[in-house]
């Protein structure tokens, strides 16, 4: 049974977390956290998402807070995430012991020359690391093929994530690269923001599925999608707080994820709980209890709190 708005909001804390670096064009991360009977849950769809899409994020928060996450334990290998910045070395210092990195490319303010410079710097500083790049749907097919060939001259990539917008375009990029550099393709938005998340597998459009708990509606739903896709998987954060990271770690453990994109707490100046330690490039699957003092210090103003409360009400209509 879906909880009511009153059930959720009576347990809610709205927080604003300052970012250490600009990421996805934002400098603060807002989230509504739910202190539920089964644990803490998170509702933090990006502000531009309409209620129909954001509702999956609410379902994920409800799963964690009211139903409870599936049982999992142990350790998960993680990747470091490098924004589009010239100060690559400073960001690397946030990820001690990590041997896989995801580099953001194709940002609106950046050129392919910029991307190549950042990739070259990263590869020079971490020559033995596995490197994946993420274009967030920015390229045409021709641009993606050009970039893949340029990147291949710097180093072999683990994969290029979501180079183009549609599954059909990903399939064409993959076909054109197969006889040349053969760089693998990963799908993210073509799974989590698509009407048919299984189209990428049907078209042979990807080698790897990048799956995020909140946009897919929770750990249970993510595991179902992964099983049906039949692809290798990388579980990643949707820029989650420490609370949302719990679900990501559980999902990564249950699905046998490649190095998971779950070390993103290090992109925040402050979070509601201390960053999980990364030990030899891995993080432990544990549950987080936010620090009451941090919840108070990071609480949103009344206007933003009310905005998030209304967003919960709007999204409940789609569950």
Regions found by a protein language model. Give the residues of each.
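Catalytic beta/alpha-barrel core
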Residues: 100-111, 130-137, 155-167, 182-193, ...
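Shared catalytic-loop signature of beta/alpha-barrel
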Residues: 60-61, 195-294, 303
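Residue-level detector of flexible, active-site-proximal loop/helix-junction positions
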Residues: 21, 85, 192, 240, ...
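Glycine-enriched alpha-helix->loop->beta-strand junction motifs that scaffold or abut catalytic
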Residues: 96-99, 126-128, 149-157, 174-185, ...
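Solvent-exposed, charged interface segments at domain starts and junctions
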Residues: 2-14, 176-209
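Active-site-adjacent beta->alpha loops and helix N-cap segments on the catalytic face
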Residues: 107-125, 139-143, 163-177, 194-196, ...
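N-terminal capping/lid subdomain adjacent to the active-site entrance of alpha/beta enzymes
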Residues: 1-154, 179-180, 273-319
